[in-house]
């Protein structure tokens, strides 16, 4: 075996430029594959991270407007959700709906504590289920509870960012104190963690308190609920169709009018995201494998050239008793050595590149003015995947070396000795 490697080393060093170019194509193939997979993972991790911020099996219903005349009423009529719609949701769909709530908002509010104040705050009237559906992280205190709701208490839950504005020196100590909102005194009952998004800077008060302060009547704003028993996209579509028809009928709109309400179904959105991330991963693997193919072709070509140049040598070997297997083994081992060595270099450089991406743009965020979200998180590839890609390249390189190796093994000594 030592003699084989010594002979391979002599052959490689004798054709340095050709070996270097072939090795570059192998290393480049592995490098590009790992970088592509890392970038894809960064995008997928960003999507998954944002998805985890809400309860998957939940829906939010928004009022819209009619798009067609019905029952003597014209199109373009606004649909405002109300208490009857909440009752219908709770009672008419009890087989699937768990916890029903609603949300009303009032923007541009000023909150004051002592000499500090913060402006342009969105105050939301919510039900207790809001914390579960939107997965808010409480740092201290509690969220709005049923007692707050029933007694219309002036309780308020702040984000950490708002608390820092009102009490910069010790924001968490604001819990349990009185602040002013809408010129009324509210007791801070909880402070939740801010995740840098606009939505996380809202202040929350009981839904019933909001109604009484802002005279909202029987309007509910958005209806929010969790559900169970809807496990496929088809089941969710059937539920949405039935729900829309019942709500439309209640508002004297056509049952098939899809613009009367907008349903944000986080479950179907989650299914679509899973499909999208799967397609992204598959597409990146396909592109990466085609890049690997260029390296494999390079290995095959250099082996064919090697066989052609050494035809006379192989003929002499066979004439003095060398077996076809020994020649076959020589070519295959040379192919494996080239792909292994340069494949390893490509793998190391690829890992280094993904680590650099992670250090520089691994926490990239997008901000559209309404919210900010991380879109590129941890763009790295596991060592297992890197090794698998390299092993795949080595196996492919071995197969690529088989064609010229078989050609070399079949050379007849007389024909080989006649070769130039």
Predicted segments with their positions:
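Peri-transmembrane interface segments
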Residues: 47, 237, 254-288
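Short juxtamembrane loops and helix-capping segments at transmembrane helix boundaries
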Residues: 51-52, 352-387
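Mid-to-C-terminal secondary-structure elements
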Residues: 129-144, 152-253
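Short cytosolic juxtamembrane segments of multi-pass membrane proteins
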Residues: 2-3, 405-420
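A short amphipathic helical element positioned immediately N-terminal to and/or at the very start
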Residues: 1-13, 85, 89-90
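Transmembrane alpha-helical interface segments in multi-pass membrane proteins
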Residues: 6-9, 13, 17-25, 32-40, ...
């Amino acid at each position: 075996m030592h003699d084989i490697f010594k002979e391979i080393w002599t052959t490689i060093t004798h054709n340095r430029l050709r070996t270097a170019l072939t090795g570059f194509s192998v290393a480049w193939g592995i490098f590009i594959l790992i970088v592509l997979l890392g970038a894809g993972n960064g995008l997928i991790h960003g999507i998954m991270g944002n998805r985890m911020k809400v309860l998957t099996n939940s829906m939010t219903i928004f009022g819209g407007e009619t798009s067609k005349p019905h029952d003597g009423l014209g199109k373009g009529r606004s649909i405002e959700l109300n208490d009857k719609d909440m009752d219908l949701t709770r009672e008419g769909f009890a087989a699937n709906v768990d916890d029903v709530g609603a949300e009303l908002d009032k923007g541009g509010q000023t909150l004051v504590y002592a000499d500090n104040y913060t402006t342009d705050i969105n105050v939301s009237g919510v039900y207790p289920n809001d914390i579960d559906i939107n997965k808010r992280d409480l740092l201290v205190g509690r969220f709005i509870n049923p007692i707050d709701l029933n007694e219309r208490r002036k309780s308020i839950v702040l984000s950490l960012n708002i608390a820092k504005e009102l009490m910069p020196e010790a924001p968490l100590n604001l819990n349990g104190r009185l602040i002013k909102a809408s010129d009324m005194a509210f007791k801070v009952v909880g402070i939740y963690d801010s995740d840098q998004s606009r939505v996380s800077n809202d202040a929350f008060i009981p839904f019933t308190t909001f109604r009484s302060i802002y005279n909202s009547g029987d309007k509910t704003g958005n209806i929010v609920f969790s559900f169970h028993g809807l496990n496929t996209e088809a089941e969710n579509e059937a539920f949405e169709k039935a729900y829309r028809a019942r709500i439309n009928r209640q508002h004297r709109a056509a049952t098939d009018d899809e613009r009367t309400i907008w349903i944000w179904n986080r479950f179907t959105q989650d299914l679509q995201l899973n499909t999208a991330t799967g397609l992204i991963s598959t597409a990146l693997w396909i592109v990466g494998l085609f890049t690997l193919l260029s390296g494999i072709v390079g290995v095959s070509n250099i082996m064919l050239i090697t066989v052609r140049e050494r035809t006379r040598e192989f003929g002499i070997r066979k004439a003095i008793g060398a077996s076809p297997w020994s020649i076959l083994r020589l070519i295959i081992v040379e192919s494996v050595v080239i792909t292994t060595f340069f494949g390893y270099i490509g793998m190391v450089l690829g890992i280094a590149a993904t680590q650099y991406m992670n250090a520089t743009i691994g926490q990239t965020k997008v901000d559209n003015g309404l919210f900010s979200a991380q879109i590129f998180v941890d763009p790295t590839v596991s060592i297992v995947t890197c090794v698998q890609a390299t092993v795949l390249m080595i196996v492919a390189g071995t197969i690529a070396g088989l064609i010229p190796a078989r050609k070399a093994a079949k050379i007849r000594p007389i024909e080989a000795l006649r070769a130039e």
